């Protein structure tokens, strides 16, 4: 490696400096080289453009994957709320047998009376989307008995019962089910807003992580160039000591400068690994086999192209498209729904009710009991007068041969204050509070956009200043090296110029990287709050909604 080569070169050249100082410096370089050599090399290097990084994040980022499930959860919530409108089918079958002990001569049996009854029922009931409720029930029965005085045995009965109830005031425009359905739809819209916000925030983080990695790599190159300059100065000074134009003590300063630059290289290499991990976590699937072994080589270099910034247009765009503002407006819409519901609940409970019942009976009709014959002690002898089967009975029910109907209105009104009035007062105050919070959030958004625009403009100026500083430092170092070569300079000033140039190069690289990141932030701040924050908007009647995040109650 490069460090090992430096150690070997220094060993071959040798110097006339003290054995103690030379051996200490060489040992430190060897230790640093050994540490670098022992680090595991990356198994694979992947060339990556910034657009490819964005596409990978859209496919594999865990945060986006998590948020993509939320709209599906909200779809289930809408279906759950709508399920209260689903019809409910009910069936029933029962059989009853009863044996009675006769307690009088007119009980209808000598020793006991056996009654047997079979009942079946089929019904459907439903709450309708406009607040009404209906129920339809069909019943049938078959009754047999040993009672001698019973007119029918067996007796068949059937009836159809229809009921309908329609709210006229309370629960007419909106009821609890319609409130839940409407709020569930708004929650579904909110999940889409939050998903788009998470995607935008993640892509912003990916782009910034990409530029951070690019900066770390360029910074390492700058530190390596500084190290190479200091090593060249060390070699030049060693030659001057050999020919007697420089004191041996000046070698120590050169060695110290090399060691200091070596430390900066080590730190720069560690920063690259940290930047690699940060980008890796944003764009790769942790379940992939090469998650930790692959490293990235950015193919897009951070460029500096001055761009005009229209702050007013950006503020207008943010006020129209910011996810936290959209979430806040969504919460106000939910508050409107809740206010409408509670305003309706303070109205009188007036319902129109209609009931329609049609019945029919049949079976085997027996002749009347001859009580005169019974008085003489003759046995009871009854004959079949007529028979009507189940089909005839069902026909009577369908044709409404024996109808029974009822139409009525029920009115209910609580005396004194009630819970609905308190709820309405509460949600109105919360709605007013939420409107003020929205105005405050709009002010925060405008401030954030202006700050982001100011950062872009500041970084533009930083790049120009840092570039000019780097060019001047290059000229300064060149002048000091010429003076040193002519025997008119000092080692201290050469090393100072090298350090200044290194700092200037790092500052220029940092300024260009910060400029590109500020452009990313300026675009993102018009869509999402930077840092995933945001305000809190109170949703009247349903708790608190975090704006700009993904927390709801």
Question: Residue ranges of each PLM-predicted region?
Answer:
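Acidic, low-complexity, intrinsically disordered peripheral segments
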Residues: 3-9, 19-22, 99, 279, ...
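Transmembrane beta-barrel strands of outer-membrane/channel proteins
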Residues: 91-97, 136-142, 352-358
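Periplasmic alpha-helical coiled-coil/stalk elements that build and connect Gram-negative outer-membrane
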Residues: 81, 193-313, 455, 459, ...
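Residues that define the transmembrane beta-barrel architecture of outer-membrane proteins
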Residues: 114-120, 156-160, 403-405
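Sec/SRP-type N-terminal targeting helices
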Residues: 65-69, 82-83, 129-157, 169-193, ...
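Bacterial Sec-pathway N-terminal export signals of envelope proteins
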Residues: 23-117, 164-179, 183-185, 210, ...
């Amino acid at each position: 490696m490069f460090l090992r080569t430096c150690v070997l070169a220094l060993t071959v050249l040798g110097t006339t400096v003290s054995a103690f100082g030379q051996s200490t410096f060489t040992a430190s370089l060897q230790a640093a080289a050994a540490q670098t050599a022992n680090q595991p090399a990356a198994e694979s290097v992947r060339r990556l453009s910034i657009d490819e990084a964005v596409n990978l994040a859209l496919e594999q980022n865990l945060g986006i994957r998590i948020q993509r499930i939320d709209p599906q959860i909200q779809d289930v919530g809408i279906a759950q709320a709508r399920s209260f409108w689903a019809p409910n089918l009910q069936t029933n079958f029962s059989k009853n047998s009863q044996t009675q002990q006769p307690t009088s001569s007119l009980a209808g049996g000598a020793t006991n009376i056996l009654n047997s009854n079979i009942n079946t029922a089929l019904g459907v009931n439903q709450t309708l989307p406009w607040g009404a409720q209906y129920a339809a029930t069909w019943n049938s029965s078959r009754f047999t008995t040993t009672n001698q005085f019973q007119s029918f045995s067996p007796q068949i009965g059937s009836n159809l019962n229809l009921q309908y109830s329609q709210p006229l005031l309370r629960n007419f425009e909106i009821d609890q089910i319609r409130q839940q359905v409407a709020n569930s739809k708004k929650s579904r819209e909110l999940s889409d807003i939050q998903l788009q916000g998470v995607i935008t925030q993640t892509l912003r983080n990916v782009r910034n992580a990409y530029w951070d990695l690019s900066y770390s790599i360029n910074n390492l190159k700058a530190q390596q160039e500084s190290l190479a300059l200091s090593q060249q100065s060390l070699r030049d000074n060693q030659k001057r000591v050999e020919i007697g134009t420089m004191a041996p003590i000046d070698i120590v300063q050169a060695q110290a400068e090399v060691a200091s630059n070596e430390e900066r290289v080590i730190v720069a290499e560690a920063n690259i690994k940290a930047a690699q991990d940060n980008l890796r976590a944003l764009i790769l699937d942790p379940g992939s086999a090469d998650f930790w072994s692959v490293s990235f080589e950015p193919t897009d270099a951070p460029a500096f192209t001055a761009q005009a910034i229209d702050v007013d247009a950006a503020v207008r765009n943010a006020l129209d498209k910011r996810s936290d503002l959209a979430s806040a407006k969504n919460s106000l819409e939910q508050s409107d729904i809740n206010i409408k519901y509670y305003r309706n609940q303070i109205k009188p409970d007036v319902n129109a009710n209609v009931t329609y019942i049609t019945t029919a009976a049949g079976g085997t009709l027996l002749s009347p009991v001859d009580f005169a014959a019974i008085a003489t002690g003759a046995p009871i002898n009854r004959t079949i007068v007529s028979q009507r089967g189940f089909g005839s009975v069902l026909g009577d029910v369908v044709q409404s041969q024996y109808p029974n109907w009822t139409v009525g209105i029920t009115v209910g009104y609580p005396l004194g204050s009630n819970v609905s009035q308190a709820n309405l007062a509460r949600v109105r105050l919360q709605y007013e509070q939420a409107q003020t919070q929205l105005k405050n959030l709009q002010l925060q958004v405008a401030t954030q956009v202006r700050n982001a625009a100011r950062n872009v403009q500041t970084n533009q100026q930083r790049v120009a200043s840092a570039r000019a500083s780097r060019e001047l430092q290059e000229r300064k170092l060149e002048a000091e090296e010429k003076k040193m070569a002519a025997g008119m300079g000092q080692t201290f000033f050469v090393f100072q110029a090298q350090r200044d140039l290194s700092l200037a190069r790092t500052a220029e690289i940092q300024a260009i990287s910060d400029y590109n990141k500020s452009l990313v932030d300026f675009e993102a701040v018009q869509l999402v709050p930077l840092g995933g924050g945001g305000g809190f908007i109170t949703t009247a009647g349903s708790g608190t909604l975090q704006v700009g995040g993904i927390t709801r109650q």
